[in-house]
From Swiss-Prot:
NCBIfam families: acyl_carrier. 4'-phosphopantetheine is transferred from CoA to a specific serine of apo-ACP by acpS. This modification is essential for activity because fatty acids are bound in thioester linkage to the sulfhydryl of the prosthetic group. This is Acyl carrier protein 3, chloroplastic. GO terms for cellular component: chloroplast. Belongs to the acyl carrier protein (ACP) family. The gene is ACL1.3. Pathway: Lipid metabolism; fatty acid biosynthesis.
Amino acid sequence: MATAAAGSSLICIKSASCSLNRAQVPSGLSSLRSVSLPISGKIFPSLRSSRGPLSFRVCCQAKQETVTRVCEIVKKQLALPEDSEVNGLSKFSALGADSLDTVEIVMGLEEEFGISVEEESAQSIQTVQDAADLIEKLVGNKK
């Protein structure tokens, strides 16, 4: 996850090599909850306001293929019917998962993707999207 901070005339996104001048930032930004910005040919669809009017968090979302695989693993681990609607926004708790189920889901993800998830990272996973984003980060770190 990248973070961004606002300066007097530009917004610098630390993990991307770009900066935006004030003219590129929509006026009244403090009232927005999220905004999409094209940066160096990439779109950051989840640029969200956090603390203060010009402080942001950029969420780079995982590939749809990864999200779909995570959905299938979650359905299998929770023994959900095949026609159950599970998507990136699905919270494990809303699907009926308790803490043991969540541990089993993480173990299934580790096996499926050939990764190892640290306990601290596993505890931060609340949704299918959280899991998919973490998987892509860990798989990317292995390369």
